[in-house]
Amino acid sequence: IHGQIDGVDHPIAPTIVFANSLGTTLALWRKVLPLLPDGIRIIRYDLRGHGQSDIPDGPYTMGQLISDAAAICDAADVTDAMFVGLSVGGMIGQGLAVKRPDLIRALVLSNTAAKIGNQQLWDDRIAAVHAQGMAAMADTVMARWFGRDFANTPEVTPWQDMVSSANPKGYVGVCAAIAGTD
């Protein structure tokens, strides 16, 4: 799993771990970093099958995604971190707080739930990726993420590019993990 540490690189520094959403990379958080206070350690990582992380054959499970997050934290000697999770990143944070409470002091969860959608929704999304590719999926995702007026601005281009360039195998693998979570 590919991760990056920004800010203070010391285990005793207050730590924030960021886990991103399906189809995105750790670059998702880049505009947030300058807004954070000095003196903290910031850990971002690419989910399994995303960005610079390995892309193993799927399907993946939520347990694997949670174990990946734990491995990132263990490798950086994290204890007592604030975990910020967006969408599937929030699902991972919830699981990590249950399985490894030694790692988590606080959770910040956005656009997430204990279960997102149903099996049919994820089966349809997987089929759409196989049939139409990631560029078509990115169009669908942008329409869901952004309002119509904002979606037609150049500010959306980096987001569109991020999802369009996601590896289909990794995207589908994480879709399966979300579908299998209850």
Model-assigned labels for residue ranges:
Residues 2-58:
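Conserved HGGG/HGGXW glycine-rich cap/lid loop of the alpha/beta-hydrolase fold
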Residues 63-81:
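Conserved acidic catalytic loop of the alpha/beta-hydrolase fold
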Residues 12, 38, 77-80, 101-102:
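Active-site acidic short loop of glycosyltransferases
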Residues 20-22, 81, 85-87:
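Conserved alpha/beta-hydrolase "nucleophile elbow" surrounding the catalytic nucleophile
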Residues 91-99, 103-139:
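Flexible "cap/lid" loop of the alpha/beta hydrolase fold
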Residues 46, 82, 105-108:
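Residue in the alpha/beta-hydrolase core beta-strand immediately N-terminal to the catalytic nucleophile
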Residues 117-120, 131-182:
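Conserved alpha/beta-hydrolase catalytic His-Asp/Glu region
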Residues 65, 83-85, 110:
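Short beta-strand immediately N-terminal to the catalytic nucleophile in serine-hydrolase-like folds
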